[in-house]
Amino acid sequence: MGDYLSHLEEYVKNLYGRLGITSPHHIDMLKIAKDLDIWVHFEDMGSMMVKYDGMYSIVLNQKKSREEQWEDFGHELCHVLKHAGNHFQMNKLFRELQEFQANQFMYHFCVPTFMLLQMELPQWRSQALATIAAVFRVTKEFADKRLDMFERRKAGIQFQKRLAYLLSHKRPNAYEEGDQQHLQVAEEKALYHIGKNI
């Protein structure tokens, strides 16, 4: 799947690479913030990103668990890295788009695909969730959603690979020769293999 990383997955991988982080054990929220010149504040209020006088701060709710703070940090970090302008002065649809993007970024930043690919996850889903939650220090609910995203992505890539295989193994002149039966058999075989791997 490494050759099939999405733009966001590649962006996150490159960001971690620039920070010198290659495994989950090297992830340290406060060190990441320091390396990116972001101040982190723990307050009794909702999490948010603040830009003042050219400096970025991320405010995290001090009453939340470490796991929830890490998840919120991932969300707010997207606003720092990818979004410009005053969030509150934007129209509703644009704000919703930015929130959607920040949520997608959060899942991929807190539990990066390139790191998941390096792991041998347990076969049982409950154990896989517990492993992801423990290794990446996220909540079980977060791990559940992230594993769903990861599995759907893998299934989509398997589909792409099988489809590419099907298209590359068709006889070039089958239509001209009227060999419809050959094409139908090849398509059925490919669809069978796709179904087996999804």
Swiss-Prot record:
**InterPro entries to which the protein is assigned, alphabetical:** IrrE_HExxH (IPR010359)
Q: Which domain of life is it from?
A: Bacteria
Instruction: Give the gene name.
Output: xkdA
Give the protein's recorded name. Answer: Phage-like element PBSX protein XkdA
Similarity-based family:
To B.subtilis YqaB.
